Amino acid sequence: MKVYAAPFEKFVNLADARLGTKILSVTDDWFADANRLFQPTPAVWKEGVFDDNGKWMDGWESRRKRFEGYDSAVIKLGVAGTLKGVDIDTSFFTGNFPPSASLEACFLASGEPDENTAWTEVLSSVELKGNSHHYHEISHDQAFSHLRFNIYPDGGVARLRVYGVPHRDWSKVTESEQIDLVAALNGGRSIACSDEHYGSMSNILNPGRGVNMGDGWETARRRTPGNDWVIVALGHKGEVEKVIVDTLHFKGNYPDSCSIQGAFVKGGTDSQIETQSLFWRELLPSQKLTMHAEHEFAEQVKAIGPITHIRLNVFPDGGVSRLRVLGKVSR
């Protein structure tokens, strides 16, 4: 079982490039493109690699400041959401990391921030160390769509992970509209799994198809009786009409079969939900899977009414690239 450095790491990384997060403006990224902050893969060191501006670094790096002030980057999150925590990662930045950093946020239904935008400080200035992860909890009920990441006075940061719960205005979704109820962009999140040795459980809810085998959820080889599983909270309660299980890129390591259970959960913690999931109703009976393919199940889906959570069971183990649970929202 994966050990998380901070409890909030189980939430969706709202600042993931795969969700569409990008830099809108930056005071300076002379040495390294600020958009590298959002890459889902860990930062790497490339020994002896230089470009026209100096040593190639996997992250955002500004020039040495020779005047007053500090550097900042304005960020559009791929999906707006309420913030739970942040990881400011300075991996491989040793003599060139910022001594401190802070984070501000705002919510805009449309458009981009300008000089009149009111920013809310969600993380006051914190000290940074070189080649380190810095985990800080954030507690704000408000949803935010944009961030302003400040580093004092200059330097380099490898990755910025901003964990939270995606936000969607469900009042604009009609009851006749079929949507992916578990998509990360719709607020779906993986909350527990039996194992995620090779790939994060949250990957299966990302938009698009997986880019490679690492862009999915894969368990270790099971050497004991039983099967692997992952529990997903829907972005909104709804009735399921179709399920898509995608094993793209998984060829010698795809599950032999899968099934799905569902439940309407009222209250309780994530750990309590994990225990209760053993007794959830069958939504999709066991279905055979094949390698490197999308599997659509509609006629096989049982009508069990509105649900809030699903449990994907894979037998006995293996990898799944994406999971889509299509249906209509329930009011």
From Swiss-Prot:
<dbReference type="GO" id="GO:0004037">
    <property type="term" value="F:allantoicase activity"/>
</dbReference>
<comment type="similarity">
    <text>Belongs to the allantoicase family.</text>
</comment>
<keyword id="KW-0378">Hydrolase</keyword>
<dbReference type="Pfam" id="PF03561">
    <property type="entry name" value="Allantoicase"/>
</dbReference>
<protein>
    <recommendedName>
        <fullName>Probable allantoicase</fullName>
        <ecNumber>3.5.3.4</ecNumber>
    </recommendedName>
</protein>
<dbReference type="InterPro" id="IPR015908">
    <property type="entry name" value="Allantoicase_dom"/>
</dbReference>
<dbReference type="InterPro" id="IPR008979">
    <property type="entry name" value="Galactose-bd-like_sf"/>
</dbReference>
<dbReference type="GO" id="GO:0006144">
    <property type="term" value="P:purine nucleobase metabolic process"/>
</dbReference>
<keyword id="KW-0659">Purine metabolism</keyword>
<comment type="pathway">
    <text>Nitrogen metabolism; (S)-allantoin degradation; (S)-ureidoglycolate from allantoate (aminidohydrolase route): step 1/1.</text>
</comment>
<dbReference type="InterPro" id="IPR005164">
    <property type="entry name" value="Allantoicase"/>
</dbReference>
<dbReference type="GO" id="GO:0000256">
    <property type="term" value="P:allantoin catabolic process"/>
</dbReference>
